[in-house]
Design a protein with these regions (language model features):
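A conserved mid-protein helix/loop that constitutes part of the nucleotide-sugar donor-binding site
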Residues: 16-24, 200-216, 235-238
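Aromatic "clamp/platform" in nucleotide-sugar-dependent glycosyltransferases that forms part
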Residues: 276
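Donor nucleotide-sugar binding/catalytic pocket of nucleotide-sugar-dependent glycosyltransferases
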Residues: 141-159, 163-180
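Glycosyltransferase donor-sugar binding loop
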Residues: 41-43, 224-238, 253-255
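Membrane-proximal helix-turn-helix segments that form the acceptor-binding/catalytic region
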Residues: 125-146
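Conserved donor-binding/catalytic core segment of Leloir-type glycosyltransferases
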Residues: 186-203, 209-212, 226
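Nucleotide-activated donor-binding/catalytic signature segment of Leloir-type glycosyltransferases, i.e.
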Residues: 237-260
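Conserved acidic donor-binding segment of nucleotide-sugar-dependent glycosyltransferases
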Residues: 312-320
Length: 321
């Protein structure tokens, strides 16, 4: 069997994690008779006996390069390789190749969440919800099979795209964690709040700063908040950093961490997770496995992961009180 995997957008964060999971799965399947071809952009992946890697780094130069690749190069590659199955990890199917079976992995949640972005508020997110989202929904209808990470995404896809639940299967992210140290109940750990998140507005760091400012006005400052930002990643991060410094808030910007370093923080802090747009919310599961206390946004994705967990408190992600 020949399986062709497309994921040229993936370069970092959750998208890259999904790609790496399938690559590892392909390498481990060397004795199953399945030949894999991965079509990617910039990630470095080694070829093996049953895995071939086709890299197209120029795809990342601009949206026009990506559009050209999607409309012309990708269909041509499919016809040339003649696979038994296409697996698209790009949230949309490969166009103009109807005779080939297509499995679509949908992990972009923006078109399906309740919160709607205004054009002036965030032009990119508005575009995903109102333009790219239409292509995602159309692809869900066209694909032979759909894979999502959570039950709430399955229900949302069924509702938005009007497809049968039998067409969609749920595959939670594989999380092979060797927990070396569980959360330790100490005064310092209960006063330390940790938020591992990228510098994007939907991660909702701002609500943390608002809450810290309110606590300062009440004379409460015997705690610390640790963010995995350095304050210089983009305008959003710089705005957060300058506000925290200006208001004298007990917030530390420690920069990005390796995965093992993140796990170490789970053992000595409370996870605070105010993000209101996620497909899965991986830190929630990671902290749960480390038995850490969690303060999470009151959202569908949070409840799906944490409703069976005792050490969690939910809050309204737009209310600093």
């Amino acid at each position: 069997m020949k399986r062709m995997v497309f994921d040229v957008p993936a370069t970092a964060s959750g998208a890259l994690t999904v790609l790496e999971e399938y690559y590892k799965r392909a390498v481990k399947s060397a004795n199953t008779g399945v030949q894999w071809t991965f079509v990617i952009s910039t990630p470095e992946m080694e070829e093996t006996e049953n895995v071939r890697v086709l890299r197209y780094p120029w795809v990342k130069k601009s949206w026009l390069h990506r559009l050209f690749f999607d409309c012309f190069v990708a269909p041509q590659l499919v016809r040339k390789q003649n696979p038994d199955e296409i697996l698209s990890l790009e949230n949309v199917t490969i166009p103009f190749v109807r005779k080939f079976k297509q499995v679509l992995y949908v992990h972009q949640s923006l078109p399906f969440v309740e919160y709607k972005f205004g054009f002036k508020e965030n032009m990119l997110y508005w575009t995903y919800q109102n333009i790219i989202g239409r292509f995602i929904i159309r692809s869900i209808r066209k694909a032979d099979e759909i894979i999502v990470q959570t039950n709430w995404m399955k229900e949302a896809c069924c509702q938005k795209a009007k497809v049968s639940p039998s067409k969609i299967r749920v595959e939670p992210p594989e999380l092979n964690i060797e927990v070396k140290k569980y959360f330790t109940l100490e005064a310092s750990s209960l006063r330390t709040f940790f938020y591992p998140a990228s510098p994007n507005s939907h991660k909702n760091h701002r609500i943390i700063l608002e809450a810290c400012k309110k606590l300062k006005e009440l004379g409460i400052d015997d705690y610390r908040v640790v963010l995995t930002l350095n304050g210089h990643e983009n305008e959003y991060a710089l705005e957060l950093y300058e506000k925290a410094q200006r208001d004298g808030l007990p917030i530390e910007f420690i920069g990005s961490l390796k995965r093992e370093e993140v796990y170490e923080w789970y053992s000595k802090s409370v996870l605070i997770f105010p993000s209101y747009i996620e497909t899965f919310g991986l830190p929630l599961l990671e902290a749960k496995l480390h038995k850490a206390p969690i303060i999470a946004s009151d959202t569908l994705f949070s409840h799906e992961i944490l409703d069976d967990y005792e050490n969690v408190w939910f809050f309204e992600p737009f209310d600093a009180d």
